[in-house]
Swiss-Prot record:
The keyword Chaperone does not apply. Pathway: Cofactor biosynthesis; NAD(+) biosynthesis; deamido-NAD(+) from nicotinate D-ribonucleotide: step 1/1. NCBIfam families: cyt_tran_rel (TIGR00125), nicotinate (nicotinamide) nucleotide adenylyltransferase (TIGR00482), PRK00071.1-3 (NF000840), PRK00071.1-4 (NF000841). This is Probable nicotinate-nucleotide adenylyltransferase. It comes from Listeria monocytogenes serovar 1/2a (strain ATCC BAA-679 / EGD-e). GO terms for molecular function: ATP binding; nicotinate-nucleotide adenylyltransferase activity.
Length: 188
């Protein structure tokens, strides 16, 4: 029997409670063995200024998943030079773990961008895409996407960075403490 592993990619700048809830809900609803958090360095679809460093983002992710045995961090995309594509990462993971079915978890807002992903026609044969439903957001795409429901959460890392003074309620306590201690995103 194949293993079932979920992958949640993103910049995680910063990682927040919606990321944690997405992972928990995907694991529960799809009966996944574990979730790999896949931080990326230069997402092909984003241009972000004021980012936390790679090390800071990984440290915040570690703080967020601390004590959850079925959650792990895979830093391979951070080691790549240039842009990092999901296709390349998944190709490598499938070679390394041929006995695993991968479930790539994306927010409802990313589903509509799937047709623009690098080698998407091959990628949809390699992984099962899992779209997390967001309130009032139900995009349709020409690919099979397993949809899971999640309690209402509409926060994003961008909104947190832009209003860090009011972000505490959306962050795990240890991540909030880390942001304050390291004065990230202008937090003093």
């Amino acid at each position: 029997m194949k293993h079932k592993v979920g992958i949640l990619g993103g910049t995680f700048d910063p990682p927040h409670l919606a990321h944690l809830h997405m992972a928990e809900e995907a694991k529960k609803q799809l009966e996944l063995e574990k979730i790999l958090f896949l931080p990326n360095k230069i997402p092909p679809h984003k241009h972000i200024s004021g980012m936390a460093s790679i090390n800071e983002r990984v440290e915040m992710l570690q703080l967020m998943i601390e004590g959850i045995d079925s959650f792990e961090i895979d830093t391979r995309e951070l080691m790549r030079t240039g842009k990092s594509y999901t296709y390349d990462t998944m190709r490598d993971m499938i070679i390394e773990q041929p006995d695993t079915d991968f479930y790539f978890i994306i927010g409802g807002d990313m589903v509509e961008y799937l047709p623009k992903w690098y080698h998407i026609d091959d990628l949809v044969k390699m992984v099962t895409f899992v779209g997390v439903n967001r309130p009032l957001y139900q995009p349709e795409v020409p690919y099979d996407v397993v949809k899971i429901d999640m309690p209402k959460t509409t926060i994003s890392s961008t909104e947190i960075r832009n209003d860090i003074e009011h972000a505490e309620a959306f962050l795990p306590e240890k991540v909030w403490s880390y942001i304050k201690e390291h004065q990230l995103y202008g937090k003093k």
